[in-house]
Amino acid sequence: LAGLRAIPNLNVFRPADARETQAAWYLAVTSEKTPTALVLTRQNLTVEEGTDFDKVAKGAYVVYENAADFDTILIATGSEVNLAVAAAKELEAQGEKVRVVSVPSTDIFDVQDAAYKEEILPNAVRRRVAIEMAATQSWYKYVGLDGAVIGIDKFGASAPAAKVMEEYGFTVARVIEVVKNLK
């Protein structure tokens, strides 16, 4: 995934669900300027209530928010968007104010104007956690010096999916722990 993102002029999409996949496919087949890579999962994912076909064209957008005065941003892509929303709902139950941003394409988000980037990832909110089941290096530009990234920076493991996800910290409990440690 990091290798694909490093290729100049290649739009890489890692959609969160069927709705984002439809949008990514549409953008791929209608693109006249750049090739596209769709990175899909074999997981059986639910369609998130907040995913939006039209907003995929911006590369990143708010998929969940429980308060206008949020102080935490969870940034996720692909199947991890489901995890981020589940963690946000649990954090909400604990009194936290959280925004979840789905990032189906870092390439497309990175070329948006500064005003849109600020709307999605306001500089004033520095408590940020990015979540992706891949190398972490793509995410530090979004979480900044005060944030954290939950990812995989070692060679993969082989086991049933649930066991691997737990081993690498892709659980609601781990996301909450990382968020709480940022306070």
Labelled PLM ranges:
Residues 1-31, 171, 176-178:
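Conserved thiamine diphosphate
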Residues 21, 30-183:
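Thiamine diphosphate
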